[in-house]
Design a protein with these regions (language model features):
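Short beta-strand elements that form the blades of beta-propeller/WD-repeat-like
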Residues: 96-108, 148-156, 197-206, 236, ...
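Solenoidal tandem-repeat scaffolds enriched in leucines and small polar residues
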Residues: 208-296
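A short beta-strand motif characteristic of beta-propeller blades
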Residues: 73-83, 125-135, 172-184, 221-228, ...
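Repeated scaffold domains used in trafficking and secretory/extracellular systems
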Residues: 85-94, 133-148, 182-196, 230-240, ...
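Structural motif
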Residues: 108-119, 158-167, 200, 208-214, ...
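Beta-strand-rich domains and repeat architectures in extracellular enzymes and scaffolds
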Residues: 2-28, 55-150, 188-192, 352
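Blade-level signature of beta-propeller repeat domains, shared across WD40, Kelch, NHL, RCC1
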Residues: 388-460
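Loop/turn-rich, solvent-exposed surfaces of beta-rich toroidal or solenoidal domains
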Residues: 103-106, 296-306, 312, 320-368
Length: 460
C-alpha cells in the first residue's frame, strides 16, 4: 500500500488508491456457479435485420403495445404524464452481458400499465420477453437480471420490501417469492448493481447512522444479512469477479466528506479505505474494471467536481483529463472495455453525455486523451451499454420501429501518442493532455498496521 502525489497542475492533492488483498484476488479468479436449472424459455421469435448492422426482433401485438417511457411527448418532456416514473425505469444489464431487464409500459384496453421486460443479448440478435403478472407493477419497483435468465423484482408496500424471481413459462410468467425486508422510517433500500457471479443479488439498506448490505437472491432462506457499514453509503461498484469486494461511497457518521471504501463481504463486511485524494475532498468511485484495474472517479479535489481515472493497486497518480470536462454538458461513464489485462490505459470507456440537445455517446481511452463524441441510436436507453473484449460497444435502444434493438459501435482509433500531425495541432483538435508533465511520484510506504488491504504487491 502506498500513498502517491497527484499531478500538481491538475489537482494539487495527494491520492491513495488501495490494492485488494491477495486472498480476495485469488477468489476473483473463480467464477461462481449457479447450480440451478435453466428457466423455461419461450420459443425464440423471428428477427429482422435492421439498419447499420443492428437487429430488430418481433413486432409486439397491438393488444400489448410497448411504449418507451423515455420518448418525449408533444411538450418535449419525457414520458407523456409519467415523467417521474420514467426516471426510475432503469435498464440493467447482467454482469456477463447475457440478459438485461427493465420496467416498461404497455397500453392495454386504453390503460397504461408497468410490467417487467427481459432482453436476451448474447445471441445472434436481441429479443425481448415480457414478464407481466395479473397486476401491473408500481413504477418505483426495481428489476435486476440474473445470468440464468430469471429477473429479480423488488416491490415496496409502505415500509415493507418484497423480493421475487420472475421467469417465462410458455405463454405466462412464473414467480418465485424470496422473502421480504421491513425498513424503519427514514431508511432507504436500493438494489446494488448485478453481482459478478451472476447468481446473487444484493441490496443496500441506508439508515441514518449505518448502512446494511443484504443478500436478497442466492441465499438459502430469504434475505440474508451480510454486513453493517458505519455511515450513510451510496453507489456500489464491484472490484473483483467473485462478487466479494464491494466499493461504496460513504459519508461518515456526523457528516464529513464522502470517501469510497472497500467492503470485503467474505470477511463479514470488513471496511477499508479505497480513495483518499485530499483530506476534505469528496471522492466517489463510479466504475471499476477487474481485468485491468482501471478506476473511474469523480472528485472535487481539483476545486470542483471532475471526472478522473486511476489504477487499483498502483502508485501512479490519479489524473483528471481536460478532455473529460467539455463545456455545458454532463459526462458520466457507464461501461469499460473488459479483457485488457494489466493495460488500463488501453481500455475504451463509454460515457453518457447530456446536454441541451439531449443525450449522446462519448468514447475515451486514457492513452488517447481524446473524447470522441458519437450520435446515439434513436431510442437509446440512455446510460446503458456494454463493451465486447474486441472493442465493440453495444448500445440497446427501443423505438416505434424497433422495440428491441442493439446498435454496434466500434471504438474509434486514437492517434499514436507523439506521432503524426494530429499531435502538432492538439489544441485545435481537442486532444488535450491529462495533466502537465511532472517527475515520477515518490511513493511513501504506509505502516503495515495502517494498510487497508494486504497480500498484493502494487504493480509498477
Amino acid at each position: 500500500m502506498t500513498a502517491c502525489a497527484i499531478e500538481s497542475e491538475t489537482a494539487g492533492a495527494a491520492a491513495t488508491v488501495s490494492p485488494v488483498s491477495g486472498e480476495a484476488g485469488k477468489a476473483g479468479e473463480a467464477e461462481g456457479s449457479g447450480g440451478r436449472e435453466e428457466p423455461e424459455e419461450p420459443e425464440r421469435p423471428e428477427a429482422a435485420r435492421g439498419p447499420e448492422g443492428t437487429w430488430g426482433p418481433y413486432e409486439p401485438a397491438k393488444s400489448q403495445r410497448v411504449v418507451d417511457p423515455l420518448a418525449p411527448d408533444e411538450s418535449g418532456a419525457p414520458g407523456g404524464g409519467v415523467r417521474a416514473a420514467a426516471r426510475a425505469a432503469a435498464f440493467t444489464i447482467a454482469a456477463d452481458g447475457s440478459y438485461a431487464a427493465r420496467l416498461t409500459l404497455s397500453a392495454t384496453a386504453d390503460a397504461a400499465a408497468w410490467f417487467p421486460e427481459r432482453w436476451t443479448l448474447d445471441g445472434h440478435e436481441p429479443y425481448a420477453v415480457p414478464l407481466p403478472l395479473d397486476q401491473p407493477e408500481e413504477p418505483g419497483s426495481d428489476v435486476l437480471p440474473l445470468a440464468d435468465g430469471r429477473v429479480l423484482i423488488r416491490r415496496q408496500v409502505a415500509d415493507r420490501h418484497t423480493f421475487s424471481l420472475l421467469y417465462p413459462t410458455g405463454p405466462g410468467t412464473g414467480e418465485l417469492p424470496l422473502g421480504a425486508l421491513e425498513c424503519a422510517d427514514g431508511t432507504h433500500l436500493t438494489l446494488l448493481p448485478p453481482s459478478p457471479d451472476g447468481a446473487s443479488a444484493y441490496a443496500l439498506s441506508i439508515g441514518e447512522h449505518s448502512t446494511t448490505v443484504w443478500l436478497v437472491a442466492g441465499g438459502a432462506f430469504g434475505p440474508v444479512h451480510v454486513a453493517d457499514v458505519p455511515g450513510r453509503c451510496s453507489g456500489g461498484v464491484w472490484l473483483d469477479r467473485a462478487g466479494r469486494l464491494l466499493a461504496l461511497d460513504r459519508e461518515p457518521v456526523g457528516g464529513g466528506p464522502v470517501k469510497a471504501v472497500a467492503v470485503d463481504l467474505g470477511r463479514g463486511g470488513e471496511v477499508t479505505p479505497l480513495l483518499q485524494i485530499a483530506s476534505d475532498s469528496n471522492d466517489r468511485l463510479l466504475l471499476a474494471d477487474a481485468d485491468s484495474g482501471l478506476l473511474l472517479i469523480r472528485s472535487d479535489a481539483p476545486g470542483h467536481d471532475r471526472l478522473g481515472w486511476g489504477v487499483l493497486g498502483s502508485c501512479l497518480p490519479v489524473r483528471f483529463p481536460e478532455c473529460l470536462r467539455p463545456a455545458d454538458v454532463a459526462v458520466t461513464p457507464f461501461a469499460v472495455q473488459p479483457g485488457q489485462m494489466l493495460m488500463p490505459e488501453s481500455c475504451a470507456v463509454a460515457l453518457r453525455i447530456d446536454g441541451a440537445a439531449g443525450s449522446w455517446v462519448g468514447v475515451w481511452r486514457p492513452t488517447g486523451r481524446r473524447l470522441h463524441q458519437l450520435a446515439a441510436p434513436e431510442g437509446w436507453l440512455a446510460g446503458s451499454g456494454l463493451w465486447t473484449r474486441d472493442g465493440v460497444l453495444k448500445l440497446p435502444y427501443a423505438n416505434a420501429d424497433v422495440p428491441c434493438g442493439v446498435a454496434l459501435v466500434e471504438a474509434p482509433v486514437d492517434e499514436e501518442r507523439g506521432a503524426g500531425p494530429a499531435w502538432a495541432t492538439a489544441t485545435e483538435s481537442g486532444m488535450q493532455p491529462s495533466a502537465a508533465a511532472t517527475p515520477p511520484a515518490v511513493c511513501k510506504p504506509v505502516p503495515l498496521g495502517q494498510a487497508p488491504l494486504v497480500g498484493r504487491t502494487a504493480p509498477g
